[in-house]
Amino acid sequence: MKYLNIFKSKVIFSSFLIFAFTKDAYAYLDPGSGNAIICLILSLAGAVLYYLKSVFYRIISIVTGKKISHEKNEKVSIFSEGKNYWLTYKPIVEELIACKISFIYYTIDIDDPALLIDNEYMHSRYVGTGDRAFAKVGSLKTPIMITTTPNIGCPTYPLRRPGKVKKLCHVWHSICDSSCYHLGCLDHYDVALTVGTWVEDSLRQVERIRKLTPKTVVPVGLPYFDELKKNYDLRISDSAQKNDKNSAKTILLAPSWGTKSCLRVYGTDFIKEVLEEGYNIIYRPHPQSLKVEMDFVNNVISDFKEYKGFSFDHDPDATESMMKSDMMISDKSGVRFDYAFIYEKPVLSLDFSTDFIDAYEAILLGRLWGDTESELIGIRLQPENRNMIMESVKKTLQYSGKEIKNFREKVLCNYGCSSEHIVDWIKNEIQP
């Protein structure tokens, strides 16, 4: 490991020299293209580094006649689909390292931030993509495998359940019960690390209906809330949240994408009405909207950009907009509960009937969690009452943060310290 670290340092230093001492090109590069090129360079550098790392270990193995493996005796593994789920895994990874528990971390994303961590207790590997990658994950032999990925073992998902893993554990990454999961996607898991005790009822109902072997259910909370709360506490201490009570109220408009967006169902006329009433609106589209429906997003921006109170936010980190706003307008998006629980601010849910629950466990349970619960974090409106949006905005702003906090305490256990409880459970499971 010492020689590998020296090798890494030389590669990084050499790369620095190449880019630091170059002649002036007198060329212009727009920020968007520049950002894309930098991301490409970093991704390529990561891929090259991990390739060279594997070559280094292979050479050492040939020279010494010994096979180098960090994975031989590990009792815990983590499987990640990539950087989009790092917020869930980061607190768990940090807690495992703090407790000096060695573990394997497999990812199918070369941009996964976990690959940048160099620690003696964490043995991370980019396994590639496609069938060979999933075959590698399927060959894991650790007694415990932690993942927030559902569907493992299902016919429609390429990853079979690892045959040598004794306890396949699913950790929740949103506030919901099993009604919000696709049919059968948790059938092959042994352990459910849930957000709270109340989730067990829905899991048991599904198990009885499909005659499944009962899972071990462990209420641990949401690990990504550990990170969100930590970031929020830091921002609060830095800024003291100096919102002027006499200034215009700010509304964060955070719709879902595609046909499930409130802007598709309710239209966009209400935005004009809210702005003309003197409110500020921060329009923050779903990240997927920026990929697949940018024309629609641009039309919304074009329609309202002349209004002084209208702004557009596409920063990957939503913290600034969430802190600046006084309430949120959304639809069925799970971000409603993140916003309400972290910032203790109310939400106006522009609801609508669903025709997609046939694919979810909700079809067995008779309801989709989050519909009526949205009334406990603010106001819930139906399309036939769309003319009442402005009135509902005013009512939502009167909603008490104390009521939201009380609901959070009923729904979410171990608020801000979920990862500690997850690792405590792991320690109890792996001890001799």
List each language-model region with its residue ranges.
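Short acidic-hydrophobic, aromatic-tinged amphipathic segments that line or gate anion-handling sites
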Residues: 124-130, 310-314, 376-386
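N-terminal secretory/membrane targeting signals
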Residues: 1-25
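Hydrophobic alpha-helical membrane-interaction elements
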Residues: 28-51
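Conserved catalytic-core segment of nucleotide-activated headgroup transferases in glycan assembly
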Residues: 84-97, 223-300, 383-386, 397-401, ...
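Active-site and donor-binding regions of nucleotide-sugar-utilizing enzymes
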Residues: 75-230
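Catalytic binding pocket for nucleotide-activated donors in carbohydrate/polymer assembly enzymes
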Residues: 214, 334-410
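Donor nucleotide-activated moiety binding/catalytic core segment of transferases
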Residues: 129, 294-337
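C-terminal alpha-helical cap of glycosyltransferases
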Residues: 415-432
